[in-house]
Amino acid sequence: MIDGHIHFHKQPYTLEIIDLMVEEALKNDVTTLYLLDHTHKFYEFLFLYDNLSGDETLGWFKKKIHVPISEYLEFIKLVKSKEYPVEIKFGLEVCYMYEYEDRLKEELAKYDFDFLIGSVHQIKGIGYDLCVEVWEGQDTDEFYKEYYYKTRRLIESNLFDILGHPDCITAYEIYPSFPLKPYLEEIAMLLKKHNMKTENNTKRGGLKHEFLEILKAHNIPIHLSSDAHRYYEVGRDFKDYIDITFGKNE
């Protein structure tokens, strides 16, 4: 079983952290780890965040610690030189911004990661999932339309292997005035067309039932993801999501 979304976050790039992640994986019957960090951690990708706006979002970004991506790449080489009882893959979670797509493509071409997750974390420069307060005064319909537009552009960019937490926008149970099903159907069809996978992210309560059923109907590959930011969150709550995601006989 895959845990397809595990961050180092504030944890150091050390073999001790890898050992702890592997130990947690074995406890939860996880056989493959997809390890990553956000692009906002690395100097080389900070151009993606030039248009952030709103007090909450700007405050969030100012607290981030940035390092050169070479630190991560050297650590990847070290880990790949070792043997572990689980498979370990390394990648990035990219905050997709269509206005910087050409520059992003050039930067990503410099690296040879095992996988790339593309995620929509900001709408019109605002980190919509940072806290419910960021929704105050916003046009919910426009937020949703922009979210799905960015998601379409992300998939059509052909830069990514996996679409990260695809219905994260519903995290606060704030919904637009229009039905979501046509948008969800379109996302599923695009994922199919562009041979992309997606995830059932257990940190965020999992995929909503309607979206999960649409993805299944289109035979979109889905794996479980803990979205762990600490080693002890690897495989978080997977037992509660296996049947829902894969069916009782799988």
Where are the regions that the model predicts?
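An N-terminally biased module of ancient metal coordination in phosphate/nucleic-acid-related enzymes
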Residues: 1-98, 103, 172-173, 178-189, ...
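A local structural micro-motif
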Residues: 33-34, 163, 199, 223, ...
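Mid-to-C-terminal alpha-helical segments outside catalytic/metal-binding sites
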Residues: 221, 233-250
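A short acidic, amphipathic alpha-helical/loop segment
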Residues: 20, 103-106, 186, 210-214, ...
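Alpha-helix capping and helix-coil boundary motifs
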Residues: 14, 100, 136-140, 237
